[in-house]
Amino acid sequence: MKAFALISLKSCDEKKIIDKLVELPEVQNAYVLFGEWDIIAELNVENSEELGTFMMEKIRTIPEVKLSSTLIVAK
């Protein structure tokens, strides 16, 4: 399943975080954004359980991450 993770950072080192993200097998692409969110990551996971585990164990454990939100692609 495809999903997108919106990520807001405590600090402004987007490149460092994107470099970490793209090393993860679930992350297809990651981009810097301007506005409320700092990064958007395109994700590919097997199911919603794997998505939840990924967000809780791999995204939210990054010390620089202040806030995240997940968007699941419907079609």
Listing of model-derived features with the role each one plays in the protein:
Residues 1-75:
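A compositional/biophysical signature of low hydrophobicity enriched in polar/charged and small residues
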